[in-house]
Amino acid sequence: MIKKIILFFAVLIAIVIGQQPLNVVPYPQQVSIGTCVIPVAPGSILIESNIESATFSVSMDRYTNLFFPFSNESEPSSNESFLLSVTIYSDDETLQLGIDESYSLSIEQGSYQLKATNIYGAMRGLETFKQLIVYNELENSYSIVCVSISDSPRYPWRGFMVDSARHYIPKNMILHMIDSLGFSKFNTLHWHMVDAVAFPVESTTYPDLTKGAFSPSATFSHDDIQEVVAYAKTYGIRVIPEFDIPGHAAAWGIGYPELVATCPDYAANVNNIPLDISNPATFTFIQNLFTEIAPLFIDNYFHTGGDELVTGCWLEDPAIANWMTKMGFSTTDAFQYFENNLDVTMKSINRTKITWNDPIDYGVQLNPETLVQVWSSGSDLQGIVNSGYKALVSFAWYLDKQNPDNNIHYEWQDTWQDFYAADPTNNISTNAENIIGGEATMWAEQINQVNWDVRVWPRAIGIAERLWSAQSVNSVSLALPRIGHFTCDLSRRGIQSGPLFPDYCPMQDDLVFTMKPNTKLSKSEIKLILNK
Amino acid sequence: MIKKIILFFAVLIAIVIGQQPLNVVPYPQQVSIGTCVIPVAPGSILIESNIESATFSVSMDRYTNLFFPFSNESEPSSNESFLLSVTIYSDDETLQLGIDESYSLSIEQGSYQLKATNIYGAMRGLETFKQLIVYNELENSYSIVCVSISDSPRYPWRGFMVDSARHYIPKNMILHMIDSLGFSKFNTLHWHMVDAVAFPVESTTYPDLTKGAFSPSATFSHDDIQEVVAYAKTYGIRVIPEFDIPGHAAAWGIGYPELVATCPDYAANVNNIPLDISNPATFTFIQNLFTEIAPLFIDNYFHTGGDELVTGCWLEDPAIANWMTKMGFSTTDAFQYFENNLDVTMKSINRTKITWNDPIDYGVQLNPETLVQVWSSGSDLQGIVNSGYKALVSFAWYLDKQNPDNNIHYEWQDTWQDFYAADPTNNISTNAENIIGGEATMWAEQINQVNWDVRVWPRAIGIAERLWSAQSVNSVSLALPRIGHFTCDLSRRGIQSGPLFPDYCPMQDDLVFTMKPNTKLSKSEIKLILNK
């Protein structure tokens, strides 16, 4: 109780000295607080937009349902209604890297105005507006403070990697994850779809690939993928598939053994098995598969992995070793040959390649347009941006690790502070402009739909804010009360996000955690959303 | 996929060499595997007991509902029914430390026999029986292996501490926690009810105590407590309240300021405020409060905390400092005086005191009957058992810590291995017989009902097995496949327990996590259970 009072005073002091006075996460770029506080009754807030959009309609309906978590318990209101007027200046719904996500929000007595260039900026504004509605438990009432906000993200790529290979993640859980990412203003879902242990993606061209799934019922159909892409679009979240090759390819070989290298000495670790790149049929296979899969996504980027290739397996496979000798290839040459061939496929499917930083570490010259996701270290990142590549930071944001930054806190959840401290430009002295953002990763060796939420939240909030807010927004003590409000709010929305300090979060009596999305899109909605 | 195969072979090898061939957690003392495997159809297993017991009836109904998680999806069975015949030799339902929890289980073609001294041993046997029923996803079928098991726990005190002070834990969530503890054969719920930040326990004698609760709706009534005690009894789980005094007492002072010491220099940390023991009214208050509360519990033990007393606060309070001078008391003397007075109350309410090890560290001579819960270290434990006290191990089992045993794993969940390795007798050379068990602790600074399951499970399974199984059952690699089955099974039962390695756990399509118990007891059932 006294700790609560201390936090309360901390917030009060923050207001007095003008720092982060709003409980909004990620913290907006510009905030100007007014003097009025407007009571709002459940059901009294209506959203009206100046444009017709199937995609944005879903977003408006979603937030209208989220504004008042305890509305079922309230008396019907006789108060007047408030209209949140949304002005969107362009009806262009193109969702690609670099779209304008800015918005402005003005709350005054009698006037709620949200303005944005496009629907995606408006979605960010709706989330901020939702967070401004404060619930008072003792009075069972809601209010909103008068405020003027002007906001836009620091980085255009605010990604989250979901691994649906180490454990199968049902489609509904992936949609549920998207809810949580959208609430936190992440804008990119990096879908690590397949890996050494499992190939859960259905292919019409190569139906035996899903023999590499954990179970016939643990697979993603084309319809599943399209639903995920459409659902993500209702949050302004791009979806980028990863097919991790040439390493981590054992699961490809369950249905198509000829695709993978044979190396008994390495086979005890399933992660050691790469594709057999000596066989031209392998490249035909990749070409055909990606030609089938890529159109299910709308994004210009396509992730081809490239990490942790075990070239020793290639050398142990006589056919591959002979081919390398014949070609006069070192292992680096062979890896280079693979990446060069992959570029041909990327061009034919009209996609820009993303890889992990491993090919570069291995001496491979990547196509200069390749986007490099750095999981190794800040010094590797410095070299990569100096070489002119655009890059994503991931090394600091491994949510699976016990000690992500080698810091030891008392509580495991306090690792959020390490994520928060990891500014993408830390120790980067030159070419920082080549860093276009970053990605949190939740590798799934010890994750399935049951524990994903709690292992990710509230810790990933620190990453979300780092990627969106100004670099100067970096105080743990100022962030803490804001995150406290937000994590409680996430729980009420059905996202399992625990607390970071002793406090009280009133929740709905009938709250259950469903591992399902908050909105069910119909087939016709999916079609409308994808075609716009 | 290949990793799965490796695990499969590991299990096969274990069977061949006779080690832990059953996927049962905690592993039983004696197992003899037969040669037959019996197919069982959903709904076909009936349980029949030779005694009438309201308490055991709840347990039988519960398990009957749990045997077939996918039964709703199955065709009605035309197979024959199987009768699990339960023989209980005594109808004595006394639930106290040291009751006989042994059972034997014999599964043969046409005969399922569970035998136990009392209903609590029979409950352990039902849990083992449940774990023996194996689900085959591809065939959507169930089977059970022929086996003969004779089992009993290594330690009589297998406890779990739940902190409902740092965050309020709704009654339904405490009942849900009891489900998870019962499934894992924990037998003691140590309910850390109040602490510095909150006093959520309603008192009819002192109604202002709940002014120290986070909210008027964040409290436990007498009825709530009795429901918890009755519900725990349906799992053979004892419930022991902790009222942590004389330190950590700030929340007592919200409603009754005269109870607590005043020390401005220490007040910045709410944990620093102890009771004012110079005031005789404090002891009257404790006496009256405990006289009211103790009868709500049926256990002979009562935990009075005693940890982290900040005597500096006493010395800064002029009234207390003057009283100490008058009495000629050092701080140790004052602490001794407090514990001596507490013993008088314990005697009057007919309870045996438990404290944390701090009074002993402080030089206090505790009543020799005091049970000491050691949270500091193994060397302290050695000294305490050498002094003749009975003791509980807790220091190795702090579930809140990032690095519980200062070991760094790659994944946070792998800290289960540290818990598993922590044998209570590690580094104990003498008087190990004074260790009567141990307790996992889940302190709640960063825990509420939303994230408790995932932060506790599957890691606490390692503790459950350490306290139940033979000391020689200590191989991580042999435990892993068993825990893999069990954690999947926990999920299907509604307990959020994640995986420890890449695998596939088929779950019900309609599975939701409710933070509620699997059984709702009626008021008349609660009365019947408590009165037996």
Curated annotation (Swiss-Prot), chains A, B:
SUPFAM superfamilies: (Trans)glycosidases, beta-N-acetylhexosaminidase-like domain. Keywords: Glycoprotein, Glycosidase, Hydrolase, Lysosome, Signal. Its EC number is 3.2.1.52. The keyword Ion transport does not apply. Residues 1-18 form the signal peptide. It holds the Pfam family Glyco_hydro_20. The active site is at E308. It catalyses: Hydrolysis of terminal non-reducing N-acetyl-D-hexosamine residues in N-acetyl-beta-D-hexosaminides. Its main location: other. One of its GO terms (biological process) is carbohydrate metabolic process. Belongs to the glycosyl hydrolase 20 family. Responsible for the degradation of GM2 gangliosides, and a variety of other molecules containing terminal N-acetyl hexosamines. This enzyme plays a role during the slug stage of development in the maintenance of pseudoplasmodia of normal size. This is Beta-hexosaminidase subunit A1. It comes from Dictyostelium discoideum (Social amoeba).
